[in-house]
């Protein structure tokens, strides 16, 4: 409940007079703040007939990905340090992945403040094709006023498919590029984490592992995808525990790496070094981790399944980092790597939408003005 106070100084108060009643009616047409609706006539033949799925470019090794995987290995290996050393140097428990990345990427670079403002409303159901067509036309007109050659309009997954169909069949909307909204990209990560990984690891004993942390009745919700926050936390704890098991003996046995890791972790948490300066030690730990994973995978199918589980959740880490840090190439690559899992788990609408989205994003470098593309992807 809120309140409003209205007060007028005594010296500005006029002598009370009778207020005459207004006989005329105030006419309000309600056109201000609204966009005129442009009707859309759907063609008999769907525009999707002209869209063909093409092979996506696969670029699984580039500097930002290597850097991301290396700093992840540093975080994971920090839990192998002896408890006495952690208490002596840090005084508190080690941070989770999110907290560690926040400190590690504190110097990610300068940024400018953008203007955010409200746009007029379209008085139609958002799923109505005329509503989407009107929005695309309005966005196209606004971009022409700003002298932009390419116009990006964001939608969630269901509306994205409709907008793609409309823009593909309308030559006047050639400059408009419908893209999936950031929240939809996180929703894709939601589906990937909670459903794809949960279905693949069903019956592996992961449910029993989660039951040691969460109530037993909530574990099915985590595995089936109805509790995203809990699933992210549960998978993160499982990855952390498995990573410690894999790395602990290797790091503790090598006093040189143990000393380097302890010193590096202390400096990184204290803000004394940047991510770039951690690369020499991070490369060693990453190679140690990869070699051990390959060795374990060759032992038996059970070990191979759990190593594959670690690799699956590693994609979530890469995708989250790409979205938070604005890493264009890492964003595209992590989404491509998720595609086979969408198909395997029978989430075909997501697989179709993500493939079309990635196909459009890959074509931007050739279709867009170089200056606009650089500003869009940096």
Language model features with spans:
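Buried hydrophobic core signal strongest for RNase H-like alpha/beta domains in large
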Residues: 1-378
């Amino acid at each position: 409940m809120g309140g409003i106070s209205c007060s007028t100084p005594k010296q500005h108060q006029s002598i009370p007079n009778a207020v005459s009643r207004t006989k005329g009616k105030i006419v309000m047409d309600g056109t201000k703040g609204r966009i005129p609706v442009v009707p859309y006539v759907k063609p008999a033949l769907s525009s999707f007939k002209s869209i063909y799925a093409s092979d996506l470019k696969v670029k699984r090794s580039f500097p930002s990905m290597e850097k991301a995987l290396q700093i992840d290995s540093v975080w994971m290996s920090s839990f192998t340090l002896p408890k006495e050393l952690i208490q002596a140097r840090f005084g508190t428990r080690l941070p989770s992945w999110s907290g560690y990345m926040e400190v590690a990427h504190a110097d990610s670079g300068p940024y400018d403040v953008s203007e955010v403002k409200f746009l007029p409303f379209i008085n139609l159901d958002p799923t109505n094709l005329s509503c989407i067509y009107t929005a695309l036309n309005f966005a196209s007109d606004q971009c022409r006023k700003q002298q932009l050659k390419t116009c990006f309009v964001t939608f969630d997954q269901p509306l994205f498919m409709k907008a793609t169909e409309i823009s593909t069949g309308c030559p006047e909307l050639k400059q408009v590029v419908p893209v999936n909204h950031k929240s939809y990209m996180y929703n894709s990560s939601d589906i990937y984490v909670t459903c794809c990984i949960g279905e693949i690891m069903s019956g592996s004993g992961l449910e029993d592992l989660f039951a040691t942390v969460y109530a037993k009745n909530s574990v099915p919700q985590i595995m089936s995808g109805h509790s995203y926050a809990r699933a992210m936390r549960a998978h993160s704890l499982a990855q952390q525990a498995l990573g410690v098991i894999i790395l602990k003996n290797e790091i503790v046995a090598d006093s040189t790496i143990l000393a380097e890791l302890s010193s590096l972790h202390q400096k990184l948490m204290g803000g004394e070094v940047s991510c770039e300066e951690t690369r020499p030690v991070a490369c060693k730990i990453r190679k140690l981790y990869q070699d051990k994973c390959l060795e374990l995978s060759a032992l038996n199918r059970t070990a191979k399944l759990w190593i594959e589980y670690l690799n699956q959740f590693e994609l979530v880490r890469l995708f989250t980092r790409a979205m938070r840090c604005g890493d264009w190439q890492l964003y595209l690559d992590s989404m491509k790597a998720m595609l086979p899992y969408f198909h395997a788990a029978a989430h075909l609408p997501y697989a179709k939408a993500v493939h079309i989205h990635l196909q459009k994003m890959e074509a931007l470098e050739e279709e867009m003005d170089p200056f606009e593309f650089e500003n869009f992807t940096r």
